[in-house]
Structure formats: structure tokens, C-alpha cells
């Protein structure tokens, strides 16, 4: 009887949840040998094509940096935009394209945001449409995989770029 009561309470609790509440998110697969930080930028798109998001408040000593998700080397983590918003709404607000920036966590800890922005010290940037996200099944990989070769990105697929005496990718 106690088991039945517990099950009823659980079922009632689940049924009272708002079915129209959505969160937009994607899984980030870090297949590299370094820890990375992932940042979604959808509000700055109209300003400059290659703009690094202006997160002046990034604090490398804090585990809580709004807008950033850390992904350990050789692991996967979920990036979620909180709130009741659909993917379609996110892309509509972002003029149909979002940018996902991938940074080396050590770079974020070592350099000021001004230096990172000025030197464009990113590992990867994906410029994604909703169609791209659906094609990728909301999975983002670093480094890029063959599935992303036709996606707009910088540096381009399979291209190595040297920044501040360091070869990326």
C-alpha cells in the first residue's frame, strides 16, 4: 500500500509539470587532450562577423561563469540555455544563426579578456543555423569531426591555425 501511495505521488507530481517548458541545449563532446570552455553567443551577431563575446566578467578562479560551460578533456557535458524557450525562439532571436565559441580553459585563466578578444584566442567557432543543429542532432564536437565539415566554422574544417606561438586543432 505504501508503495502504491508513493507511486501515485510521483505520478501526480510529474503530471503537474508544465509540458510547454523547454530549455534549449546541446551536448559538447571534448575529444581533445585539453580542458575547454564553451560559450554561446547569440546576442552580438549583428555587430561584427568574427566578434568574440564580450564577457568581461569571466573569472578563471570561479566555477560559476554565466554563459560558459567547462568540458573536461575526453569527456562530454551538457550546455543549457535556462528558461522556457524553444530552439526555434533562440534562433529567431539570433537572426537564424548562433555562434558557439570554444576556448582553451588555460588560455582563459592566463590572459585577460581584452587580450583574448584582441588576438582572437579561440580554439574553434561554429556558426550554426537551426538546420545545422538538427543535422548535428544538437551534438557539438571539439575538435571538429567529418560530420561538421560543411558547417560554417573558424578555423575551417581540418585547417590548423597558429595563434600566440601555439598551434591550434
Segments (PLM) and residue ranges:
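Asparagine-centered strand-capping/turn motif at beta-strand->loop junctions
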Residues: 26-32
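Sec-dependent bacterial lipoprotein signal peptides
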Residues: 1-17
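Intrinsically disordered, low-complexity segments enriched in small/polar residues
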Residues: 17-25, 39-169
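Short acidic/proline- and small/hydrophobic-mixed sequence motifs that coincide with surface turns
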Residues: 33-38
